[in-house]
Amino acid sequence: KRIVEAEMKAGKKLVQVGFMRRYDEGYKQLKAAVDSGKYGEALLLHCAHRNPSVPDDWDNSMAVENSMVHEIDVLRWLLGEDYATAEVRYGKSTNNGPKDLHDPQIMILTTKSGVRIDVESFVNNYNDYDIKCEIVCDGAVLNMPKPNYISVNSNATTGQAMYTDCFQRFADAYNAEIQTWINASKAGYVDGPTAWDGYCCQVAAAAASTARETQTIQPVVYDEMPDFYKK
């Protein structure tokens, strides 16, 4: 919020927040499909955010604030609306990973129009880095494609490599994000997630964190968007 206030005081948009999933081709295809209206309204979203492992200093708060925070931003952008409520529930905890982290967790978000979203965070699956997004619409189910490695047939088996971190999975998105920032900066404007987007993401993440600690459903309450960010 302080960044939003400082930017408005400066009188010009100066901040591009580092949410790179908006630049991923899979998410862009999903958004185009939703925005087209061809498949009706989005009703439900089923998502997952899985990592092979995380450092030993990870704790419960980081499942939302370091992991699922990316879903909080990209799904708000994808659907074009804010959240109304947030909750976080626990699965049976894996024996893998840090002692202060209950893993996996499920975050449930409801948008202001009533779209229900569930996001699984499993950050010690000891397997691969895997991001999923399925959108259930009135007339179709939309699944996000993902870039793949080649399929190899060898020694009477078929196999395909899997991603092990976000830098492999989202390499093209990172490059597109940075290039967008460079191009916009050279031209003297901001193009991408704004400071207001960052504020909205942090409000929802804070509500989800409170929901996790209290095991309740929490409202997501934003300030009214200033005219400065409506332009």
Model regions: which residues?
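A structural signal for well-ordered alpha-helical segments within the folded catalytic domains
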Residues: D24, K28, V69-D73, D172-Q179, ...
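C-terminal helix-rich "cap/oligomerization" subdomain common to oxidoreductases
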Residues: K1-V4, M8-K9, N183-K231
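Alpha-helical elements of Rossmann-like donor-binding domains used by nucleotide-donor carbohydrate transfer enzymes
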Residues: R2, Q29, D73-V74, I106, ...
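Rossmann-like dinucleotide-binding domain that binds NAD(P)(H)
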Residues: V54-D128, W196
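NAD(P)-dinucleotide binding in Rossmann-like oxidoreductases
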Residues: Y90, N96-D100, K112-E177
